[in-house]
Amino acid sequence: MADPSNAALRSGLNNRYRVLEVRVVRGEGRDPEKHLAVSSDPSLGDTELCVLQNGWESVPVVPGDIVHLEGDCSSGTWVINEQSGYLILYPDLLLSGTTISSSIRCMRKAVLSERFRGSECGSRQTLVGTILHEIFQQSVTNNLSPEKVEELAKKIVYGQKYLKEMYHLKLKQTEIMQEIEEYLPSFFKWTEDFVRNPANQNKMQLKLPSENKTGDCSSTVEIVDILDIEENIWSPRFGLKGKIDVTARVKIHRQGGIQSRIMPLELKSGKESNSVEHRSQVILYTLLNLERRVDPEAGFLLYLKTGTMYPVTGTRMDRRELIKLRNQVAFYLMHSTYKSAVGRQQSQLAALPPLIDDSQACKYCSQIHNCFLYSRAVEERMASVSFPPALIPIIEKETQHLKPSHLEYFSLWYLMLTLEMQSGDSKKGYKNIWMIPSLEREKAGDCVGNMIRVDQVQEVSEGQYLHSFQRKNGAVPGANLLVGDRVVVSGEENGLLGLATGYVREISATKISCLLGRNLSKLPESTTFRLDHEEGDCSIGVPFENLSKLMKDSPVSEKLRNLIIDFHKPRFIQHLSSVLPPEAKEAVASILKGLNKPQKQAMKQVLLSRDYTLIVGMPGTGKTTTICALVRILSACGFSVLLTSFTHTAVDNILLKLAKFKVGFLRLGRAQKVHPDIRKFTEEEICRSKSIKSVTDLEELYNSQPVVATACMGINHPIFVQKQFDFCIVDEASQISQPICLGPLFCSKRFVLVGDHQQLPPLVQNSEARDLGMSESLFKRLEQNQNAVVQLTVQYRMNSKIMSLSNKLVYEGKLECGSEKVSNATANLPNLKMLKLEFADASKTWLKEVLEPDKPVCFLNTEKAGCRPSDIGIISPYRHQLKVITDLMARLKENRVEVNTIDKYQGRDKSIIIVSFVRNSNDENLGALLKDWRRLNVAITRAKHKLIMVGCVPSLRRYPPLEKLLCHLQSEAMIFNLPPGAHESIHKCNIL
């Protein structure tokens, strides 16, 4: 289950209670009740009682769960029953109305849809529905005439916005337009009936829950004003979220007078059914409205095909039952793992909600593959789980292509991903936006609060609005947000959560500009905003989806299962002549001239591969140059190449080199995340500059470039549905977890993984997941097939003294300098002579020695110096220390020196690097980061000419990797013992 131990508890409107005890109480002649002992006290000292009655006792709740309570509390007792109160289980888990309404027919599908989000793949019907929504929303907002609505429809269908989806589904714009036109008469009829001339409309029965009268409830409904479209509301009170299609001000005319309400209007483009699922969504939207306004008590359901509108009343009973359903979905999601009470304490996967006994419904379910896969891989072994007899042969047929080893791989990775996701929940997720004040989040570097909107909002492109925010008072904190960061914009006051999401476009000392998906100009000018760094679950579905895809019954998935799970030996072609076209030989020979021997060997190995090649790029060995040469050679031979990496920076570093050689490529991904010099190659910029507005033009663009580049998370792009590449090259492969690395491999015939498992591994927060093997990258897993491995050992970064550290620590002497010049290079310090005069007194003699260029490696032992972590540091293993160092550098008015973590420095270098090891002897716990020799290896291989390390030798000797390094430094006389007060002398002279 999820670990709620660090959940923030509180009383009040957004209260959070921990359940301490659960008792079922049965009285004579009375229905059973559940009595919960709960506490909102962080120390769990003060407890209250929550009594669940009249059906609420069926809510699954166990000790340790976090709940929100709505209703009245009298003398420390909450009573939640048929008439009053709500219990919300795990309220910080916001579930959509779609998820909850789908759970009515099948709870299992609702739970799986939250995990495997990409399985709800697009369809013609979905695309048409999305376009119809937009046409309707814009036409009612702007009160357009029928002629203008037809113009708008053509503009949207023949515009750029939906081209990718049409390409994905192999649809023509003319087909879509024909279908859209069938709906337009109903749009006009609805506008006539409810907006322009409501008095002529047939009366509808609408009784609001607050009305006591019985009898005739007939009324006419008039839409007075459209207040918002796609209004995004998060409700941490009810654990709900949703985008309301249309928020309208409505007048209800009846005999007794006129009532005014702000109500949700839900649009449906499919068959008119007035089904319980559709009605449930509207009822949930009435609950969402409570976050921002008076209870609307009802909403409307409009079927766009017919123009028929149904009133949907949000009765207490309906809301209550839907909240109970929501609680069940939340329980299964938050209790997806458990630890057995006896025996080994390893976490295990829990059962999903039971399978429904309806093979016809299962047949058309989008989650059928994942549902049956989980049944076979996980639940089949559970004594407590039984399957409907009619489904057993269907489950076996759906999964018969999978071996036991494949099912084991699936269940292990599903468990590890779930553990990691639960571990990340406390540190990430959206809940900190409503549970932690902006000032507190700001201090932690995750938010900028107290902002007001300035300047006019500009619509930069369809659905993209440029907003400028300025601090209400004071300067904008510098390091909290960076250009390209995803942000969630909320109002500082309660109820205005998650107004819009988008990206930081520009930052200055006084202003932050963001590109948002919604226009916030309708909000009052006095609204104060907070901009939170989005670390939410936008990418959570990708690894689960890739894992699911690996288990599919398809040729590409079968090949990858054989290679990755069953370790089939990679195959190679015997002769280079059979893959090298005669017309490419001259170009290939020319490219090879600029490479060293190991790099040439790598080129040959890749060309001869039928399955995969691993290139070990040791520090400074020209990994980017090698990949660039490889892409040029493959391109010259007529092969198509998918180039990918975990980070946008790594992709762009290769593309910057490729651009110099005039190799054509297409860069996928948001322009904001791409290097400025590469933006002209992005799909976004090309579509804009070439005015691409047809599916044919888009297809031509995709087919015109043999090289396509994207980050690993970008493989859900439509191009990959239709295009198979000859080669896929994955840079930083040793840093990418297996399920994420799988994504691009589905799109290629052969793949090349480039990395070095002696450097940073995939980042895993959960210690149990790490122990189970989650930090093993695909690169490391496949490295056992040594015939597929090529090592790059000639390095051009470090001088020989710096290189010797890594050779001793990790590489067993394999690294060698590329030339004498590299071997003997020292730091260029033109002002050193002048500085030496400043260091004349005895307290600074150590500084003279340390700065000598002919001493390339120095370890400054701070044992006696009393040097605090905040005094020195450029690379640090700890993010918290970075803020301290950055602030110090700002006070020194020095902004040219880059301060970053080890992880951020991977793949990069500088002439001089200072590494600050921040632990001292007072620290009780050994830092996990300092125990990791791979991180240490990265830290000591970033400097070209001078490496200065700062730390307390006795404290650091407790870490095995550092003990080994310190022994080598001691034997080479590279450790300098600083005198007491050494740090004070630094402040007195201007070194920077």
UniProtKB/Swiss-Prot annotation:
GO-annotated molecular function: 4 iron, 4 sulfur cluster binding; 5'-3' DNA helicase activity; 5'-flap endonuclease activity; ATP binding; ATP hydrolysis activity; DNA binding; metal ion binding; nuclease activity
Family the entry assigns: Belongs to the DNA2/NAM7 helicase family.
Record-annotated membrane-spanning stretches: none
The species this protein was found in: Gallus gallus
Annotated region (Helicase activity), positions in chain: 489-992
One GO cellular component term: nucleus
Purpose of the protein: Key enzyme involved in DNA replication and DNA repair in nucleus and mitochondrion. Involved in Okazaki fragments processing by cleaving long flaps that escape FEN1: flaps that are longer than 27 nucleotides are coated by replication protein A complex (RPA), leading to recruit DNA2 which cleaves the flap until it is too short to bind RPA and becomes a substrate for FEN1. Also involved in 5'-end resection of DNA during double-strand break (DSB) repair by mediating the cleavage of 5'-ssDNA, while the 3'-ssDNA cleavage is prevented by the presence of RPA.
Region (Nuclease activity): 51-488
Subcellular location: Nucleus; Mitochondrion
Catalytic activity field: ATP + H2O = ADP + phosphate + H(+)
Main localization of the protein described in the UniProt heading: nucleus
Obligatory cofactor(s): [4Fe-4S] cluster
Cofactor note: Binds 1 [4Fe-4S] cluster.
Residues that coordinate or bind [4Fe-4S] cluster: 106, 362, 365, 371
Protein name: DNA replication ATP-dependent helicase/nuclease DNA2
Annotated keywords: 4Fe-4S, ATP-binding, DNA damage, DNA repair, DNA replication, DNA-binding, Endonuclease, Helicase, Hydrolase, Iron, Iron-sulfur, Metal-binding, Mitochondrion, Multifunctional enzyme, Nuclease, Nucleotide-binding, Nucleus
Enzyme Commission identifier(s): 3.1.-.-, 3.6.4.12
Pfam family, one: AAA_12
Residue sites binding ATP per the record: 617-624
Transcription regulation among keywords: no
InterPro entries assigned to the protein according to its UniProt record, in alphabetical order: Dna2/JHS1_DEXXQ-box, DNA2/NAM7-like, DNA2/NAM7-like_C, DNA2/NAM7_AAA_11, DNA2_Rift, DNA_replication_fac_Dna2_N, P-loop_NTPase, PDDEXK-like_dom_sf
GO biological process: base-excision repair; DNA double-strand break processing; DNA replication; DNA replication checkpoint signaling; DNA replication, Okazaki fragment processing; DNA replication, removal of RNA primer; mitochondrial DNA replication; positive regulation of DNA replication
